[in-house]
């Protein structure tokens, strides 16, 4: 029986997260969630189970869900993570392909000083 779209996305996200665990080496992960109206990013320390920094289009300058708003979120989450002393992260794209808004967020976070 074929998987539903929700089950397929969960399976993709789990596959990505499993690979990240082997690559992390104690680094926190930059997790991205994308909805039709907003984009959210968090820097999460999985060893302690704590969110170190977060940002979304709900609070960033560019409200909405376009590439410019995603870039603003990437810059904001990177600045907040660097304030907390986090410079090295692993990028968790979840079930999303590395394209469009997700790529814009990642590029802006790299430009703002995060290494991944």
UniProtKB/Swiss-Prot annotation:
GO terms for molecular function: 5S rRNA binding; structural constituent of ribosome. Disulfide bonds: none annotated. It holds the Pfam family Ribosomal_L18p. InterPro entries: Ribosomal_uL18_bac-type, Ribosomal_uL18_bac/euk. Gene3D superfamilies: 3.30.420.100. The keyword Nuclease does not apply. GO terms for biological process: translation. Keywords: Ribonucleoprotein, Ribosomal protein, RNA-binding, rRNA-binding. Part of the 50S ribosomal subunit; part of the 5S rRNA/L5/L18/L25 subcomplex. Contacts the 5S and 23S rRNAs. HAMAP family: Ribosomal_uL18_B. This is one of the proteins that bind and probably mediate the attachment of the 5S RNA into the large ribosomal subunit, where it forms part of the central protuberance. NCBIfam families: L18_bact (TIGR00060). This is Large ribosomal subunit protein uL18.
């Amino acid at each position: 029986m074929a998987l539903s779209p929700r089950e397929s996305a969960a399976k993709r996200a789990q596959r990505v997260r499993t690979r990240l665990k082997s690559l992390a080496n104690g680094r926190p992960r930059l997790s991205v969630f994308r909805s039709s109206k907003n984009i959210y990013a968090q820097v999460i320390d999985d060893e302690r189970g704590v969110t170190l920094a977060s940002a979304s289009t709900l609070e960033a300058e560019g409200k909405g869900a376009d590439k410019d708003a995603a870039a603003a979120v990437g810059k904001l989450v990177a600045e907040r993570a660097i304030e907390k002393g986090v410079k090295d992260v692993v990028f968790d794209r979840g079930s999303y392909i590395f394209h469009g808004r997700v790529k814009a967020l990642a590029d802006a976070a790299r430009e703002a000083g995060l290494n991944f």
